[in-house]
């Protein structure tokens, strides 16, 4: 059996990636989120496939088809809520995965890190299109508001928006193409994940100390497969509890009202995992500047490797950088809270301060902290 997995053309790839892969002996539970993301992706593809069998991408029947799935299809309600809450788990794991990369300096693997940022954009686009499909009030108005942001692009903005809509407003053509793109995007994400793993296995995993671990490596199986299985069981327990006891906890009540272009909801807001970006967008009065800030809130991650000034890779032994990192986490939580609040005083000013702080910490304070820590080490 050992010879087959080491010599068979297909099994050999699996063996080198998940069985005999040399891994640092000291990686902690923060390294579990990669496998959890893989499990979430598989779950999303399977549940999405079953939902696609019953869903109809038509403005007159989309809302009814989702109701039909929940009421008439065997375990349709569970499939629907596994898919919806699975997306929340996906983003939770993704944010923690990126946060771990920032804390332990994994961004120094440039190709792996840049693919990670592209994956973040791809999953956000996929989730946005998926949010439109139930064709509730928040689906319709969310699609209208977010796609309309592209009109801020000079010269081609208006034409681009109408091209995406397939008409002069969000309608049947928009829903049909969003449904098609949402379905195909999951496979694009799968391809990007494979590229991400390819680059990761070229360099090997980072570790909490941020040092070269070639002298002390262990095989991935059985040590880390068992560790990952524990993480998967934990995540499934949380997801199951959410689906079975509070399936609508992370959703919006407005989405249980069919889309009505003549009735605007008092407060249009996206899903919780977009709220931080929504807060940054709203904090800037100018439309084009707001859109640029929205894009830069994610794209700024590509600059992090070039802003690294410390002689140490990881923040494990860098107390000043640790403080800044946790201030950044608190700032992102504040932005998430602000993104879900109405646009009024004092939320406007809090959002602006938090948005400025977000960019300032990453662009100015983090590099300065690195230089200061280098100086203190030589002092």
From Swiss-Prot:
The keyword Transmembrane helix applies. Heme b b566 binds at residues 97, 196. A ubiquinone binds at residue 201. It is a multi-pass membrane protein. One of its GO terms (biological process) is mitochondrial electron transport, ubiquinol to cytochrome c. Binds 2 heme b groups non-covalently. Its main location: mitochondrion. One of its GO terms (molecular function) is metal ion binding. GO terms for cellular component: mitochondrial inner membrane; respiratory chain complex III. It is found in: Mitochondrion inner membrane. It comes from the Eukaryota. Heme 1 (or BL or b562) is low-potential and absorbs at about 562 nm, and heme 2 (or BH or b566) is high-potential and absorbs at about 566 nm. PANTHER family: CYTOCHROME B. This is Cytochrome b. The gene is MT-CYB.
